[in-house]
Amino acid sequence: MKLQIPAGKANPAPPVGPALGQAGVNIMAFCKEFNARTADQAGLIIPVEITVFEDRSFTFITKTPPAAVLLKKAAGIESGSGEPNRNKVATIKRDKVREIAELKMPDLNAASIEAAMRMIEGTARSMGIVVED
């Protein structure tokens, strides 16, 4: 199962509790382990892929934060534009896009850093963020 949880803030309340409860996972054990693994990434949303086994034990893999979350943090904005084609909400430099692309590289299916940068730039465009050199 896949969830997106704020780093270091997993607790048994929804959405975490019900999703794990259905699978019969020890919710507190997951929360403690997740919070310990993501404590250094406070403020970001971390996608996590949880594998639950027959005996109700589990493993999980944390992914890199979504590109949109990293772009919002880099641009210092609360949310993207409602009309990205009409009103732009922020501007970020291309080297910042490279940083984000390098961070996201393990989770993107891009062959090169340039291809990853193009993906991140596309996300930025769809959020109303202008990328400049």
Swiss-Prot record:
SUPFAM superfamilies: Ribosomal L11/L12e N-terminal domain (SSF54747), Ribosomal protein L11, C-terminal domain (SSF46906)
Keyword terms, alphabetized: Methylation, Ribonucleoprotein, Ribosomal protein, RNA-binding, rRNA-binding
A Gene Ontology molecular function term of the record: rRNA binding
Domain of life: Bacteria
Leader sequence segment: none
Post-translational modification: One or more lysine residues are methylated.
SMART domains named among the record's database cross-references: RL11
GO cellular component: cytosolic large ribosomal subunit; ribonucleoprotein complex
Keyword rRNA-binding: yes
Subunit structure, as described in the record: Part of the ribosomal stalk of the 50S ribosomal subunit. Interacts with L10 and the large rRNA to form the base of the stalk. L10 forms an elongated spine to which 2 L12 dimers bind in a sequential fashion forming a pentameric L10(L12)2(L12)2 complex.
Family: Belongs to the universal ribosomal protein uL11 family.
Protein name (database record): Large ribosomal subunit protein uL11
